[in-house]
A protein has these predicted regions:
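A domain-level signal for the structural core that forms small-molecule/cofactor-binding pockets
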Residues: 1-260
């Protein structure tokens, strides 16, 4: 059983905005320290950014307007906490406590992820999809239901009828769709709106990639300040995650679909 949402789901819009601001921070300095929370809906986008490098309201507003349209932007930017900054002063260390797992992706999860991408390539609007064995549920906004019935004749499509979706119908918040992003690898920490020093980003990516490579479950934990995880220097894990983020096109692109 698996649920997948597309990049125009309000929660993913929030993730994408958060990712865009992290990308902006990395354009300004090589290793920023940043954590961004986004709440979006009904014409307003609220953003709080704790950051070592100033982004400015103009940069944040430009990202919101590009991704979500001409919304009113409420932007709060504060410096990173001094104790957290000191943790990274002498080298790359885990930026927070956390538990993590990587689980090999199942065929069912791969199948639904592809269905979601196929539909989104034709209808780039808010959508949510579920696959539970033979039961396929497709909720796709702004679509021609008959088109989907022709391709997926056995699916349950828009059970309550046609709908519009988007941030004028539903609110979105950062890191609220981790099940969609990570499948069975979801634990407590969110992937989006954070720099690579955050274990929620780098260790989650590392554990997921290791599980796909070994085809075995991976479980890890860390304490803030740790300089090794899984017997490897944390700096090495950060570079693995950095290369992965680069391979998908940056933090904003990563936020579109997550790891699955």
């Amino acid at each position: 059983m698996f649920e997948k949402v597309n990049p125009c789901h309000p929660d993913k819009v929030a993730d994408r905005i958060a990712g865009a601001l992290v990308d902006l921070a990395y354009k300004k300095v090589e290793n920023p320290r940043i954590a961004v929370e986004v709440l979006i809906g009904h014409g307003v986008c609220h953003i709080i950014a704790e950051t070592s490098v100033s982004l400015g309201k103009a940069g944040a507003t430009a990202a919101v307007h590009r991704i979500a349209g001409n919304l009113t932007v409420d932007y709060v930017e504060v410096p990173q906490d001094g104790h957290l900054a000191d943790n990274q002063a002498d080298g790359v260390r885990c930026g927070d406590n956390g538990i993590f797992k990587g689980i090999p992706v199942t065929e069912e999860q791969k199948k639904l992820s592809q269905i979601a991408r196929d539909i989104f390539s034709v209808y780039p609007h808010d959508g949510k999809y579920i696959l539970d064995g033979d039961r396929l549920i497709l909720c796709q906004s702004n679509t021609e239901t008959q088109y989907l019935r022709e391709i997926y004749p056995d699916a349950e499509i828009n059970p309550l009828g046609d709908w519009t979706g988007g941030t004028d119908v539903d609110t979105g918040a950062t890191n609220r769709k981790l099940g969609s992003d990570m499948a069975d690898s979801a634990t407590g920490g969110g992937l989006h709106g954070k720099d690579l020093s955050k274990a929620d980003v780098s260790v989650n990516i590392y554990a997921f990639l290791k599980a796909q490579e070994t085809r075995k479950p991976v479980t890890l934990c860390c304490a803030i300040g740790d300089d090794t995880v899984d017997g490897r220097p944390y700096a090495e894990i950060v570079e693995i995650a950095r290369n992965y983020i680069r391979s998908v096109g940056g933090f904003e692109k990563f936020a579109e679909w997550g790891l699955v």
